Design a protein with these regions (language model features):
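Long, charged alpha-helical interface segments
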Residues: 94-96, 100-169
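Feature captures the catalytic cores and cofactor-binding loops of soluble hydro-lyases/lyases
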Residues: 1-105, 109-119, 123-124
Length: 170
């Protein structure tokens, strides 16, 4: 049982409302043992992996700035890391994230009015495939196996996957 008013108590109460929980911070993932931190975080905001005991995946992490190595570890774990302005967000806010539009909206629970509070870009271009695969590593393995099998069968590369692109040079 969690002490009233603590972070874990707040999380438990939000979970009872059956809504997705996002972790939000101004600077995220610095000075931490990132895999341990991601596992602890996803334990509270992720979803159980079917047929894998005591392991979760997914979740949403929003940070004003997310340390690159923490961002990558979140990707590996199947989480959606988003860098966005978090200055208008507070604990317990009900938000709507529109990833393909790059919008975060705050929802007034009384009027159901949605106010856009910030915009963001999904990064990298393969992030949606990574989430569907349950993580970046799963995607890389699945894409590689698919390519090898299709090659053996003398088929073209699959167009199902978003392929990574190299950044443009200035």
């Amino acid at each position: 049982e969690f002490k009233e008013g603590t972070g874990l108590n707040i999380l438990e109460n939000l979970k009872l409302q059956n809504i997705q929980i996002a972790y939000v911070g101004d600077v995220v993932g610095t000075g931490s043992s990132r895999k341990s931190a991601i596992n602890s975080l996803i334990w509270h905001i992720g979803e159980p992996i079917p047929y894998v005991p005591n392991k979760k995946t997914g979740g949403i992490i929003i940070g004003g700035k997310i340390a690159p190595i923490f961002f990558n570890t979140a990707q590996d774990s199947g989480a959606l890391p988003i860098e966005a302005d978090v200055s208008q967000l507070e604990t317990g806010d009900i938000i709507k994230i529109e990833p393909y539009k790059g919008l975060i909206k705050k929802i007034d629970t009384n009027s159901k009015f949605e106010k856009t509070i910030c915009e963001f870009d999904l990064k990298p271009s393969t992030i949606t495939d990574e989430i569907q695969a349950g993580g970046r590593i799963n995607l890389m393995i699945g894409r590689s196996l698919t390519d090898k099998i299709r090659s053996k069968l003398k088929l073209n590369s699959s167009t199902v996957f978003i392929r990574p692109t190299n950044p443009k040079k200035n």
